[in-house]
Amino acid sequence: MTKMIRESIQKLIDGTNLTYEESLEVMKEVMSGQATSAQIAALLTALRMKGETVEEIIAFAEIMKECSHQIRPRIKGRLVDTCGTGGDKIKTFNISTTAAFVVAGAGVAIAKHGNRSVTSQSGSADVLERLGLNLDMTPEAVQNSVEQVGIGFMFAPAFHPAMKYAIGPRREIGIRTIFNVLGPLTNPACANAQVLGVYDRKLADPLAHALKSLGCEEAMVVHGLDGLDEISTVGKTAIAWLREDEVTTTETVPKDFGVKHARIEEIKGTTPDESAEILFKILNGHCAADDPRREIVLVNAAAGIIVGGKAEDFSYGMELGRKSINSGTAYKKLKALIKASAGNLSKLEELESKYG
């Protein structure tokens, strides 16, 4: 029953890449529950030690997507996901999650795909749940939210039920694996534009090409050279930019965006509760215009606005992001999403009362 995964583990240990076809078959064994937890853990570890190829990643992503509950929001224009692989070296607040609401407030439809933390302190699901979001939305409810609110949140376990077979092994081995990469590549709403933060610069170009093969129209795959899986305002950022069927690579520094160099401690967030409060303060206008946390969100939101087709460059993208926050639209998107999820608005009301 599990001949392929056994053979694949041996090949990987020997340092041999799996073919596209072998990768498809072994992922089918994982997603169907045929592989044991020990076999899955061995496979993930061996893949990580060898280094995943683009072919392996694409094949795994295709099977994972086939096994998911997919939705097809009816929207005009592009549908964007802002997400990261997690596993970065700096424990920041939830930058890409905060940026998603700024992008939505700028008129770009967002299908945010996320999960609880696996290797970091606060996943997107953790922080949004703290703010009152009901994670148990049906696929139909999420589709309606994207169409009517302009943003929806897809809780990975609800949309990827077959992933239950890998949850235990992932948590038990406690290392970054191919699944950190697969989540962002398998958006159940088939988002056709993306800002994808990665924990390793070496992943940027391969994942940009993987997104192209998987049907993405425009994407920025980004890695802060200081260890961030975001566009960094602390130091340099490597960007692999997919547009018009071509992938180009570049490096940026904070001054390219017109923002000051931040210090790492200025963008950290320790707990889901702390990250939730930071997200609230940024969206509700309780951070100064030059607050490093607001600035890094604006830079990353600008990337989402660009791939979403609303801006040609970071300067205009950031201008639209500022308008999204200053007008209150970004915060309204957060409240509307929580309402659409049949969630609890009491946490937001508590924060509104606290900050006046």
Language model segments and positions:
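N-terminal glycine-rich anion-binding loops that anchor highly charged ligand groups
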Residues: M1-M4, L12-I58, E66-R74, I296
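N-terminal small/glycine-rich loop or linker at the start of catalytic domains
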Residues: T2-I13, L79-G84, A111
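Glycine-rich anion-binding loops and their surrounding alpha/beta cores
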Residues: K3, K11, L18, E66-H69, ...
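Short acidic/histidine-centered micro-motifs embedded in hydrophobic/aromatic stretches
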Residues: V26, A46, F60-I63, L320, ...
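Short beta-strand segments at enzyme active-site cores
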Residues: Q39-I40, A111-H113, V221
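Short amphipathic alpha-helical face segments that pack within enzyme cores
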Residues: A42, T98-V102, I296, N300-A303
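A glycine-rich phosphate/pyrophosphate-binding beta-strand-loop-alpha-helix module
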Residues: L44, F93-V149
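Active-site cofactor/substrate anionic-group-binding motifs, chiefly glycine-
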Residues: G51-S117
